[in-house]
From Swiss-Prot:
Protein name per its UniProtKB record: GTPase Der
SUPFAM superfamilies to which the protein is assigned, alphabetical: P-loop containing nucleoside triphosphate hydrolases
Amino-acid positions noted as binding GTP 1 in the UniProt annotation, renumbered to this chain: 9-16, 56-60, 118-121
InterPro entries: G_ENGA (IPR031166), GTP-bd (IPR006073), GTPase_Der (IPR016484), KH_dom-like (IPR032859), KH_dom-like_a/b (IPR015946), P-loop_NTPase (IPR027417), Small_GTP-bd (IPR005225)
GO annotation, biological process: ribosome biogenesis
Subunit structure: Associates with the 50S ribosomal subunit.
Function: GTPase that plays an essential role in the late steps of ribosome biogenesis.
Boundaries of every EngA-type G domain copy: 3-166, 203-376
Annotated organism of origin: Salmonella paratyphi C (strain RKS4594)
Lineage of the organism: Bacteria, Pseudomonadati, Pseudomonadota, Gammaproteobacteria, Enterobacterales
Domain KH-like: 377-461
Length: 490
């Protein structure tokens, strides 16, 4: 399960700045969900290959009345469901009563908490953080988030050791087989056999969507009609339910995010939908079913979820629920809206179903298997290079500064999602339009459906870069004569 890190603190202590630093390689998801404050930010970050979800909880206004009465509900939820909390304080402003109230609340929750003193630029860090030791949260980590100073140290000395201690796990290098095959083909050898067989593993299927779109009904319909072996297996964290099942002699694991347990004083509105649970389900899944309510249409929340799914590279099947009972005119309007707002998602199958009555539910699994097979299929270097060559023959790369961009060869760089790595000269200057052309050409040639495909470009190295030619004795004498001539002419 992907760990969750919550940024907590008073307003204007630099939480959003640190959030942007941590998620610099990812597009933050801005969510506006019922029961949660507007513009709450969720993003994916990475430290030494270990991914985690980062939450900007917004400002918590702790007062003498007690932090629980003044803390926003979404911030309470984020703290409760986070694995670790980075409690941020303002080193310039010094210790405030609100800081003490928040620290008291965090101590009562017994969450792993690290105290981060921001805005230490221009100050003596040791002197600036002295007052904050009275909060009783242990060591203080000074940073300057706006300039990035101390952020890397925070990641390496705080988050990374914590992630290793709490969730030690061996990360399978899914790209190893591709690189072994590529190197073997380059050396004229046979690639070693890979023991990993995606068909032997169950397909992890996450059902996500806004509240009341029919996720629970769809889950119950799937389990109630076609289950062979079903039992509830609580997830390792945050009560996500993993439900193994079998259909058409194929094993699946449904990741159920519909049931969110009540926690403390969190209201029912917030309880209905946990953004954190949904993001973790997407990260952990092979295929995601995005459920949309046909009667309400596509909302900004749906598009936000869709954006996170695309950034995660997960296979996708779009499910339009509550299709029954709609007039033909309304159905046509819904389809037009889908085409208009989701026209850029040309790789995903769209199913119109009624989870309540079961119509169209059975056809979902055909698209799920298709998407999973597309995302995990192995493709040889020879085939990818051949497809790239055909694409170049059909449409030449543009000229850059009078020279034609040259694409040399392509090989696989990973799967789920499929990654194609293209090597060449001046590839960094390729326009986005040509990159999209190559992506669509590979998708069509490989018949990839249900999963995004990513193209990565690598510049060929100049073998003469940073190297100086050794002059022969004759060249040395000629150079001396030329230098004498130049000096005389001056």
């Amino acid at each position: 399960m992907v760990p969750v890190v919550a940024l907590v603190g008073r307003p204007n202590v630099g939480k959003s700045t640190l959030f942007n630093r941590l998620t610099r390689t990812r597009d933050a998801l801005v969510a506006d969900f019922p029961g949660l404050t507007r513009d709450r930010k969720y993003g994916r970050a990475e430290v030494e290959g270990r991914e985690f979800i980062c939450i900007d909880t917004g400002g918590i206004d702790g007062t003498e009345d007690g932090v629980e009465t003044r803390m926003a509900e979404q911030s309470l939820l984020a703290i409760e469901e986070a694995d670790v909390v980075l409690f941020m304080v303002d080193a310039r402003a010094g210790l405030m009563p609100a800081d003490e109230a928040i620290a008291k609340h965090l101590r009562s929750r017994e969450k792993p908490t690290f105290l981060v003193a921001n805005k230490t630029d221009g100050l003596d860090p040791d002197q600036a953080v002295v007052d904050f030791y009275s909060l009783g949260l242990g060591e203080i980590y000074p940073i300057a988030a706006s300039h990035g100073r101390g952020v890397l140290s925070l990641l390496e000395h705080v988050l990374l050791p914590w992630m290793d201690d709490v969730a030690p796990q061996e990360k399978v290098d899914e790209d190893a087989e591709y690189w072994a095959q590529f190197e073997a083909e380059q050396n004229g050898e046979e690639a070693p056999e890979d023991d990993f067989d995606p068909q032997s593993l169950p397909i992890k299927l996450a059902i996500v969507g806004r509240p009341n779109v029919g996720k629970s009904t769809l889950t119950n319909r799937i389990l109630g009609e076609e289950r062979v072996v079903v039992y509830d297996m609580p997830g390792t964290t945050r009560d996500s339910i993993y439900i193994p099942m079998e259909r058409d002699e194929r094993e699946y694991v449904l990741i159920d995010t519909a049931g969110v347990r009540k926690r403390g004083k969190i209201t029912d509105a917030v309880e209905k939908f946990s953004v954190i649970k949904t993001l973790q389900a997407i990260e952990d899944a092979n295929v995601v079913l995005l459920v949309i309510d046909a009667r309400e249409g596509i909302s900004d929340q749906d598009l936000s979820l869709l954006g996170f799914i695309l950034n995660s590279g997960r296979s996708l099947v779009i499910v339009v629920n509550k299709w029954d009972g709609l007039s033909q005119e309304v159905k046509e309007q819904v389809k037009e809206t889908l085409d208009f707002r989701l026209g850029f998602i040309d790789f995903a199958r769209v199913h119109f179903i009624s989870a309540l009555h079961g119509s169209g539910v059975g056809n979902l699994f055909e698209s799920v298997r298709e998407a999973y097979d597309s995302s995990t299929r192995r493709v040889s270097t020879a085939m990818l290079t051949r497809i790239m060559t055909m694409a170049v023959e059909d449409h030449q790369p543009p000229l850059v500064r009078g020279r034609r961009v040259k694409l040399k060869y392509a090989h696989a760089g990973g799967y789920n999602p499929p990654i194609v790595v293209i090597h060449g000269n001046q590839v960094k200057d390729l326009p986005d339009s040509y990159k999209r052309y190559l992506m669509n050409y590979f998708r069509k040639s490989l018949e990839v459906m249900g999963t995004p495909i990513r193209i990565q470009f690598k510049e060929g190295e100049n073998p003469y870069a940073n190297k100086r030619n050794t002059l022969t004795p004759t060249q040395m004498r000629k150079r001396k004569r030329l230098m004498k001539h130049i000096k005389k002419s001056k």
